[in-house]
Structure formats: structure tokens, C-alpha cells
């Protein structure tokens, strides 16, 4: 076998793509000595005599057809990223013959993949969006023979392959340059598009992953390649032009992706002119019966309606200390006529809106929220969503909901009619509460929009984050249309954001939603772009399956169809050794534009043989005739 660093004389590169590819069973011959096999990803094969080098083995389907193209041995494999679908068949390689190389910056993801699936996630977990991991590591560790860094040269049969670090589609992604050709993994899809969105979403709407991708695209464009070979989709024949166009697309998209208000000023603003101070510490008055935090507590969650008889309703309560809550309750009783807080309404599923639930429940306060939010509060670790209550610290486990609301409910409370409506946006799991209060129509909207309606440059949208289960058409666009129809006088956002005279602001919010939908459609390759946006179109409930105290658990697998026609699926659960899935394979159909849930029973065979800690269970997904591979997963624990 050729060593990794053995120097050989350079040979002329013969990698100009043929006008017509030549078929060799599972392979297409793109150029003399260069072949492509399409499986869960594009697998590229360089041939020299009867030896070959592979870039991304995918599901390794092509291995069965090597002899038909004259290959007897795979000497080397190069990985572009840690994503399962580009390497899930790697165990089929003969590791006595084949050496594997991968990006050094992805070493931990490949060697210790379960480290990046947390049984008890925290907002600060590395490589996560507020506790929801954006990595998609293999179910089992991968043995790698050489770790590659930016600028390394791989010598193989006279070819010099240069390693170029290109994060963005993956935190440590690597491209491989051979003359004027680039194997760029998932950095770009043909058509100057993203391979998907969810692999580039690295933070809570601040653009870290997007900025890394833009920088990598710029880096590759500077190399002026003629042809690029992507991990998915067609060969990119006009690579330099497409990279330039892609950079422009991403740069144009970025301003609409980043929040529609100056988020860094959220906790630095001064008093709102529509409020006036009160004798209660930190509390300002919006109207005779409506109060909120003033600028000293900007960014915290607290608003309260105090009725004439002293009974009160809280609208979210979190992100500040217990002692502060106890002090302001005393102050409100002394100065604002507060006698009793009856209930606290929760606007959406994120835990920072009810971190003080335990304190309030000790005082008899009841908690209300919409039916679709309840289980996220009561069983937060059953979900792989960001910012669940447990991610805010070890003292937070769950919050019991006392009153389950339904969209359309009207609650009579102290002479007011409280209207409850489903209001998605930042997350699918949100609701709005509105009422006529002190001569104004006031709506409480949670985290769906923020900003200053008087500033024509602001459109108010909060972060775009697919991991919030937040497809734009099913979220922000619905929120905008809802507000346009409601025509409120006052919008009470969470985190102490008061928005008055919001009509034009709402219209800008609506226009932004339409605009960013169009941008995602232009950036993502699938006709139904949601397959490249949503990381939950196959998902498990519970996401964390506890087999540590019982041998059997039922898991509900939900399959989503975004298409306007029936969709066939085949989903294989890649359970670890000693765990049986019944059934092991889910095969069926899902009606157009719908979702369906299928029960699966997991059984533990011999507990003593199970490893301690988290184990990953990938879904190997086929929709209709396309094998997507091991895109998504859930986790289990058989032994603590």
C-alpha cells in the first residue's frame, strides 16, 4: 500500500469530466480514472491500476461492483465530514488493506460520538443550539488512521491531493483539491445551493455557521476551480462561477436571517415612553392595570395584570433570582394593590419563561398553557429541542401545568375575557393571549417578535432556528397573518419588550416572512425545501429512551411528508448490539402534506453486556426511491 506521505513524480491530471459519463454497474465514469457511485452520498473513486482511493464511502453500496471497473483494493478513504450519511458503510471496508483519513477538527465527533448526545442537555453544551446538538455523528466510533489539517498534502500514486479546511456545512469539514478540481463535500450543491440548512445552524440565530460557510465558499472560490464534486447532487461543471454566485446568495440572505431588530441592545434599552415608574422596585406601569419590568431588568421575563380586586395574572416569569421575585411581590402588595397572583400563563415551550415556576407554585399560583406546549414543560427531556427547562440548570426538572388551554378558548377572569390562540413563530409550540384592557387591545406574543415599531428599518422577527420546530410557513408567517388580522394596539413581547402602534411593524414582519421563505427555496435543492430545512421530519418520542430500569420501552416514530402526493418510506432503526427493535424496519406510506406516527418496541436482551451511558440510534431513511441514509437519531441508556 502507498504510504500517506510517500512522494512520487507528478503525473498530468486527467480529471476533465467527460461530456457523457460511462456506466459501470453502480459507477459512472466521469473522466479517465475518476468514477462516481451514488448512494446515501456521492462516493468518488480515483483508480490507479487495480487500486483505488475513495472520497466519502457513503453506505458502501459501490463496493460490490469494484471488480467491474477493475479495482481489487481500496487503499485509502478520505472523509469530508463526520455526518453519518457520508460514512455509514465504513465498517464494510477491509481495514487490513484500507486506511482512513479524516479532518482533525472532527476527531472527537468520530472517536467519541456519544459525547455529543446529552442525557441532560444544557444551554452551554458545545456544538449545540441551547442544548440541541447540531452534530450528526456516527452511531459507533470510527477508526481513523490519519487526521488531516488545513494545507496537508496526500500523496497517492503520483497525485498530490491538497487538504483545504472548509467549515460551514460541518464544524471541521474538509475539501480536497486535485489540480483545478475540488471535492468539496457538503459545502455547496450544484445550482449554487446549500446541501441542507440544518447542518449550518450552529447558534441561536447569530449566524456563526452561516459566516463559516461564507468564508469557506470564498476560500474555495479563490482557488478558481473548473469542476467541483459535491457530496450530493450533480457534478458542478462551472465551479468558479457557481461558488461566486453562491457567496452572493449567502451574503444577500444573511441580513434577513439575522434578527429583525438590534438584538444586542435588548438588555441595554432605556425607559419606554409609554410607561411610567412605580414605587415597586423594577416595575413600570403600561396602563392602569398592566405592569412590566423596567429597563433595569430588560431581557428578563415578567409582565402582570392586576385587577381592581387585587387578583393578578402573570404573563411569563423567569430569568431572574427568587429573591427579586419575592421582593417585587412584597412591593406590589404594598404599592400596587396586589393581593393574590392567581395564575401564570406560559407563552411557549422555552424554559426561560418559567424558571420561577417552583417559587410561584409554593405560593399557590397555577400555571396555564396551550395543550401543544404542556408536555414540553412536564417532560422536557423527551424532546431534542433547544432551551427546554432542564437546560437552565440542575435545579430545573419539569413544571406541572394546572390548566390545559386550547386554541380558541376564551377565559373569563376578573371581568376580562382572555382569548387564547395558537401562535407559532420562533417555535411551533407557542400561543398568544389577548384581551381588551384599559381601552386597548393588548396581545402577549412571547418571543415571536421584538423591536421598535417606530424604526422603519426593523421588522421585528426573532431568531430563525429550525431546531425550534419552526418552518417559516408554519411559524412566523402564521404569526404575522394572525397579528394583521388581530390589529392590536399594544404588543407585549416577552423579555420586557413593549411595542406600541405596531401596524406598519406587523406589515414589515409579514413581508420579511414571505421574503425569507423565497430565499430558503432558492438556497435549498429539494423541490420541497423543508426536507433540507427541518431536522425533525423523522423523529422519536421520547427522544431519550430510558432502559436502565426496565427492559422494554415503546417509542413513537413520527414521519413527516411535505410533498403534495403520497410518500413511501422505509426506515431502519440502527439499534446498538443487544437492543432489539420490533419492528426493526418501518415500511409504509404517509398521505400528502401530513405526518404519521408508528409505534416501535425496544427490548433489552442482556443488561450486563450493555455499556454505560448514552447510545445513539440512527434512523436509516429511504423516501420513495431515494436513500437519504442515517440523517436523524434518538438516544437510549441501558446502564447509567
What are the residue ranges of the model-derived segments?
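Conserved beta-strand hairpin/beta-sheet module of binuclear metal-dependent hydrolase folds
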Residues: 27-69, 175-190, 283-334, 432-451
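Intrinsically disordered, low-complexity Pro/Gly/Ser/Thr-rich segments with frequent PxxP/GP/PP motifs
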Residues: 579-610
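Short solvent-exposed strand-capping/beta-turn motif centered on an Asx-Ser/Thr pair
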Residues: 548, 560-566
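Low-complexity, acidic Ser/Thr/Pro/Gly-rich terminal tails and inter-domain linkers that flank the onset
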Residues: 517-548
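Terminal connector regions
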Residues: 607-640
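Short acidic, flexible loop segments centered on an aromatic residue
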Residues: 564-578
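Active-site HxH/HxHxD metal-binding segment of metal-dependent hydrolases
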Residues: 3, 63-153, 323-324, 330-410
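Metallo-beta-lactamase
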Residues: 52, 138-143, 153, 160-241, ...
